[in-house]
A protein has these predicted regions:
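Conserved, helical-rich catalytic subdomain that frames metal- and/or nucleotide-binding sites
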Residues: 49, 138, 143-236, 251-264, ...
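Glycine-rich beta-strand-to-loop/alpha-helix junction loops that act as flexible
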Residues: 97-98, 239-244
């Protein structure tokens, strides 16, 4: 069985607290975008793993392998699997590629073995792999809260067009959170942005990301990319997640295509895409 594992952007991210166990409370608007990996899993006589990216190995650090192990232990699955991962979403990008792959693995094994799960059980399994996995599993525009397990779908009024621009250097999510200063970082108004998306109002000036503050310290290329996008005429420019991808977003397809044309010789990874509204 084959599934697409769609990337996401954080249209805004507010990290407002830290718990005693070190985990952070957040509110975020997350949008799935038309950019994806493909994951194929089939029951096999022996475990096999193939990936078109040599650095994504068959280890416990691989989110797909981790998800399969969790499901095998939880549901006493004794089968072996042939796994083929066609990886397109860059790593250390803030686009949720690894968590999207894990969510796809859950959907596939759930279907193959006809596993019955409540929403609560799905979210519990997802959170064992990563905070973004519950969002990736449902794959709809949403306001996400708590540690990532609280998901409220948002009916987007409009389709938005997006240019992704990623420096070749990445950002460690762990290091970004370690350097996060809640008194100095941005705290965007997430409920206000949610209202604008539902009503179709202009979203100019409503975007923000708490993790830009530490990410800028870890990777100055992110600052440079933001400046270049703004110089090219982009109005809504933001880093996604913990970076290092920066995006600009607009309702006007041609506006984003024009900016893409101006950025084509920048030397960065560039991709034009759009939101998935359903």
């Amino acid at each position: 069985m084959k599934q697409r594992a769609y990337a996401k952007i954080n249209l805004s991210l507010d990290i407002y607290g830290v718990r005693e166990n070190g985990y952070h409370d957040l509110n975020s608007i997350m949008l799935p975008i038309d950019f994806y990996d493909e994951l194929e899993i089939a029951v096999s006589e022996k475990d096999e793993y193939q990936c078109n990216r040599h650095y994504i190995r068959n280890t416990e650090e691989n989110s797909v392998i981790k998800m399969i192990r969790i499901l095998k232990e939880r549901y006493s699955l004794e089968d072996q699997y042939r796994i083929v991962l066609n990886k397109q979403i860059p790593t250390q990008a803030g686009l949720g590629g690894g968590t999207a792959d894990a969510a796809a693995a859950l959907r596939i094994l759930k279907a193959i073995h006809d596993l019955e799960m409540t929403d609560e059980q799905i979210r519990d399994i997802c959170m064992q792999v990563g905070a973004d996995v519950p969002f990736n599993y449902y794959n709809v525009p949403a306001m996400v809260g708590g540690l990532g397990e609280q998901i409220e779908a948002i009916p987007l009024k409009k389709t938005y067009y997006i240019l992704l621009v990623k420096p070749w250097s990445g950002v460690s999510t762990k290091q970004a959170y370690e350097l996060l200063d809640l008194d100095k970082c941005d705290h965007p108004d997430i409920p206000r942005l949610r209202e604008a998306l539902i009503s179709g109002e202009n979203i100019d000036g409503l975007l923000g990301n708490s993790l830009e503050q530490p990410a800028f310290l870890l990777n100055s290329d992110i600052v440079t990319v933001k400046e270049k996008l703004k110089a090219a005429g982009a109005r809504n420019v933001l880093m996604s997640g913990s970076g290092s991808t920066v995006f600009c977003i607009a309702e006007d397809r041609e506006e984003i295509r024009r900016i893409a044309q101006e950025m084509k010789d920048s030397g960065y990874y560039i991709r034009f895409t759009r939101t998935l509204n359903q």
